[in-house]
Amino acid sequence: GSTRRGKRLSVLTSLALSALLPTVAGASTVGGNNPYQTYRDFAENKGQFQAGATNIPIFNNKGELVGHLDKAPMVDFSSVNVSSNPGVATLINPQYIASVKHNKGYQSVSFGDGQNSYHIVDRNEHSSSDLHTPRLDKLVTEVAPATVTSSSTADILNPSKYSAFYRAGSGSQYIQDSQGKRHWVTGGYGYLTGGILPTSFFYHGSDGIQLYMGGNIHDHSILPSFGEAGDSGSPLFGWNTAKGQWELVGVYSGVGGGTNLIYSLIPQSFLSQIYSEDNDAPVFFNASSGAPLQWKFDSSTGTGSLKQGSDEYAMHGQKGSDLNAGKNLTFLGHNGQIDLENSVTQGAGSLTFTDDYTVTTSNGSTWTGAGIIVDKDASVNWQVNGVKGDNLHKIGEGTLVVQGTGVNEGGLKVGDGTVVLNQQADSSGHVQAFSSVNIASGRPTVVLADNQQVNPDNISWGYRGGVLDVNGNDLTFHKLNAADYGATLGNSSDKTANITLDYQTRPADVKVNEWSSSNRGTV
């Protein structure tokens, strides 16, 4: 087929259908008057519970309308972790999650369709509250972080200021019938269910809130859900009526007296402290200097510096196997220039560019780290290759132009903004911007400067997808890797692009089982 300028084609193949089909699964104690699947769909934003949906009707098991979700648009639960131990943590920053510190066992989290696994490098436990905000090894690309409330506890407890509370979790599964009897469904951590909580929260000490839900669960909500064992760390979202937004209010800590849900609050002061500890001092480029920032790094000590004239900025990267030793760097100043003199292994440290920058190297130095954030209206010309087995994670609304030389053996995972692949050929004519490209979250666009930048079969669309702008280039796909209907092919060029889908099975791809020469029936 072909695609002309401005055309966007949704990409979905049978290879991806399995990711869309529901499986038998559920979370916590829920009311038995409603279909069990309703609670699952609610927690997974499936069916009528798409994020942003309004005035959602709720029907009981008899198909009778029992009410509407009309206090707020449907919350987006995508910031809640999935796959292993789903619901135990929520993304609150591109590199940090929130949960309870008594959750000691989990070491990694996944989001969206669970394609990527993010490893915890620092647990960041609160000194007194049942709360921790672990740091991850990479910037998350599949989803956007939840907004953590900055409201006072008094405001959170005021129903006129917080008109709705929704929860999700994967604790031990029970259904309570209309007579109050609980029926066991399955153990915890299998899948998410969720529901609506009343607005009658009250104080739990100085760092938490609690909610009474004793008696029959049906008395508390038209879609009731009560946390159980295994729900620890699961999120409580509240609708801020003044700001018109959902906010993460707290994380589930436990149950008091068998009737009270207890949530730990997330102090903004604690978050600021944690984030600050992981940042090096901002780096400022002085355009009047006439020289680039010279970036040196000593992998044996995990330390380095960026120097321009008499100005020098210290930086910290991975030290031995300690990824958390890597600190984040933010670059300020217009039309900045950075020259890598050594390969930099920044560990869990990320790079944030607030303005236009060019990053280059004259000796083939490479960079690895948590990823790159390019702020809105900024453009970064990235002329540095990665390494095999590592992926460059890119987020931020700005543009990253990849313009290195030769074959880059590293991969790309992009979750926001624009990435232009314009890798240049080396002296032997070899060119590859990335070994693989993953487009996720529904926010990003990847633009191809030509059809040599990446093997089309190594391009994939993750959770909620994004746009692959073929930019007038002809491409042949032997397979399409799309997690859902968010995958899009676009063409911003005036030139028509021909897209060939060649699914013909090659003889080498066919596996043949042969009988052994003994003729005794053994394969």
Across the structure, where does each feature detected by a protein language model lie?
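C-terminal subregion of chymotrypsin/trypsin-like serine protease catalytic domains
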Residues: 28-62, 87-103, 192-221, 225-294
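Extracellular, surface-exposed repeat architectures
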Residues: 325-404, 446-523
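Conserved H-D interstitial segment of serine endopeptidase catalytic domains
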Residues: 104-144
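Acidic Gly/Asp/Thr-rich repetitive segments characteristic of extracellular carbohydrate-active
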Residues: 292-330, 415-418, 427-439
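Catalytic histidine site
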Residues: 60-116
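Chymotrypsin/trypsin-fold serine protease catalytic domain
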Residues: 135-226
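Gram-negative bacterial Sec-dependent N-terminal signal peptides
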Residues: 1-26
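Glycine-centered positions in the ABC transporter ATPase nucleotide-binding domain
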Residues: 95, 398, 417-419, 442-444, ...
